[in-house]
Structure formats: C-alpha cells, structure tokens
Amino acid sequence: MNLENLTTERRNENTMGLDEMSVKEALQKMNQEDQKVAMAVGQELAAIEPVVEAIIKSFNQGGRLIYMGAGTSGRLGVLDAAECVPTFGVEPEMVQGLIAGGQKAMTVAVEGAEDSKELGRQDLVDLKLSANDIVVGIAASGRTPYVIGGLEYATTVGAATATVACNKNAEISKYAQMPIEVDAGPEFLTGSTRLKSGTAQKLILNMLSTISMIGIGKVYNNLMVDVKPTNEKLVERSKRIIMEATGCSYEVAELKFVEAEENVKLAIVMILTDSTKEEATQKLIDGNQFIKNTLN
C-alpha cells in the first residue's frame, strides 16, 4: 500500500514546528489551514451538482440516501443522516449512515472493519438496497476497502453511486458513477484526516442532504418548514417559522400550529391560502408537498 503519495498523508510545510509554537501561534496556523477547506470545496461544485440531482431523483422514486464510511468518514455520514430527521421531518430510513464495524465504531475503533470489502457489501445487503437508492461512499484517503465493497455491490443492484474523497485520482472514484474529489492540501497535523479532510467531508455532506431536501419541497424560501418540534426550543422555532413565512402574529401562529397538529408546513398553507386543515392538506398533495405550488 503506497500512502506517501496521498495529499492527506503528506507533511504540511506551513505547520512545521508545532511543538515549538505558543498556543496563540498554533491556533492561528490551524485557522489559516481551515480557511483553505471551504475554498477547496468550492472548486468541486460542478462534481457535487449531479450527485444532488441524483439524490433528488432517488427521493422522488421512493429511494434512500445511504452514506458509507469508516472511522471519521463513517461518523460524519451517520451524523448527517441523523440530523435529517428533526430538520426535515423525514423518516430515519430515508437517509442512513453506515459505519464500518457498526454502531460500536461510533465511539471506539473496530479492528479490521474498514479493511473488509465483504463487510461493506453485507451491510448493504442487510439494508435490502434497491435500484431506487443512492450510495455515497466517503473516504478521506480514497481507498477504504469497506467503501469499495459497498460500491461494487451497489452497482450490481443498479443503485446510483457517488463518492467523496480528499485526494485526487482516488481509488474509490473508479467504483462510482459520480466521484467527488476535494484537495484541501496536507493536514495541519500530518495524516490526521479528522481535521481538514473531515471538515471538507462535512461541508459536502451538508450540501448533499440540504440542497436535496430543498429539491423535494422541505424548504419554503429559506425556512425549514418540515421541522419536527421534538422539544421546547423547536416548538418555539416552529411558531417563529410560521410567523416568518406568513407575516402573522404570534397568537395566530400558535393557534394554527395547534390546529395543524404541530405540522408547520400545513399551518403555513392554512394561513397563506385561508384554508381549513383538510383543504390545506389536499393543496399540498396536489402541489407535490411544495408550499409555493399551493399559492398558484
């Protein structure tokens, strides 16, 4: 295995002598390196766009978005998937994160898990992967066998495939229809891909899930109108979203929120179209769940 040619494994000339720096100097250096990440991601928008479009297509045909990764890459996929539930009001099955070694690997390393192609395949078999789904393999190094095994299996069942790697000409790119390769340069701490690579991956996963959810009507203007009010903070946020979307008072927002059985999107349509709960429900069905389509 030839790792020394990978950007993520090279020493960073800008951060030599870390152990001789003051805390202030080290913080400044780290911040300087982190600022390069968003710029690097920005260079890959043309590669990210078709992946978002493929995810929207998958969702529209009842498919799922499945992230796969090992270590930090896997944890980031699990994190993004978990946040889709409260943010966009989707079922947990719609966006899922698989990590080599399973749930235990979220907190401790599982020996050998990332090196098993068969484990990657089996995890997708267990999910009953179908041609309607899309699999996004995540690997900073771009060579994780667990991810490659999953991508190979996904191809055999006809699922769409994409990858997120932090090295150019990554091995996993050969196994995906839509590879994303972002080069943010060597890590602040040599080889520690939880840092810049992890940040780059998080930014890209944010884009994939968020822009895809916009594409299926989960957002009105820039408001998350399918938020699930699962705690007191989110209940209050829900009422504010209704106020922002409609220009109504807090009292009206609260009333319609209750009438709509805490369904923010429904409450907004009820107010904007002066409809009953039943009428607003039908308008959303007719409008494919987009608020803007109920206003025509």
Curated annotation (Swiss-Prot):
Keyword Lyase: yes
GO biological process, alphabetically ordered: amino sugar catabolic process; N-acetylmuramic acid catabolic process; peptidoglycan turnover
Gene3D superfamilies hit by this protein: 1.10.8.1080, Glucose-6-phosphate isomerase like protein, domain 1
Catalysed transformations (reactions): N-acetyl-D-muramate 6-phosphate + H2O = N-acetyl-D-glucosamine 6-phosphate + (R)-lactate
Pathway the protein acts in: Amino-sugar metabolism; N-acetylmuramate degradation
UniProt keywords, alphabetically: Carbohydrate metabolism, Lyase
InterPro entries: Etherase_MurQ, Glucokinase_regulatory_CS, MURQ/GCKR, SIS_dom, SIS_dom_sf
Family: Belongs to the GCKR-like family. MurNAc-6-P etherase subfamily.
Summary of the function given for this chain in its UniProt record: Specifically catalyzes the cleavage of the D-lactyl ether substituent of MurNAc 6-phosphate, producing GlcNAc 6-phosphate and D-lactate.
HAMAP family in alphabetical order: MurQ (MF_00068)
Name of protein: N-acetylmuramic acid 6-phosphate etherase 2
Organism: Enterococcus faecalis (strain ATCC 700802 / V583)
